[in-house]
């Protein structure tokens, strides 16, 4: 007779320390969350990049990278972070005639000033159109 379904029976490697690995991953994730104007607004691209090149913007919140982060935070009922991310993103949306509606590739707060990147200094020179394409996915 087949055994009854249970979460314990579904584990592939019961002695793999999976719970410890997940707990450690959550600790690292929490360290990536940064504040904008006193409230957590998103996750940086990397805690520390090996090159430590100040010209790179790994310490910024990338819109594209934060869509799955925000979906995860929604599943964790951390709505305040998602709301802050959406609010900041909307506030930074371009209003100039040629680029109206385009979202920044990334943003960060430096010395109390919110700085947005519309592709000028982003890693790999990602265009802001890329960030704008991810917006409907999160809003859906």
Predicted feature locations:
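Acidic, mature catalytic/reactive cores of soluble proteins
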Residues: 1-140
């Amino acid at each position: 007779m087949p055994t009854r379904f249970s979460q314990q029976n579904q584990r592939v490697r019961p002695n793999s320390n999976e719970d410890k690995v997940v707990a450690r991953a959550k600790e690292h994730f929490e360290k990536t969350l940064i504040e904008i104007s006193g409230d957590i607004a998103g996750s940086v691209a990397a805690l520390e990049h090996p090159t430590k090149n100040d010209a790179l913007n790994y310490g910024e919140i990338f819109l594209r990278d934060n869509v799955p982060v925000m979906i995860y935070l929604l599943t964790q009922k951390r709505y305040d972070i998602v709301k802050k991310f959406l609010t900041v993103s909307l506030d930074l949306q371009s209003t100039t005639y040629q680029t109206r509606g385009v979202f920044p590739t990334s943003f960060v707060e430096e010395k109390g000033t919110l700085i947005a990147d519309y592709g000028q200094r982003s890693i790999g020179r990602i265009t802001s159109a890329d960030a704008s394409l991810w917006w409907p996915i999160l809003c859906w």
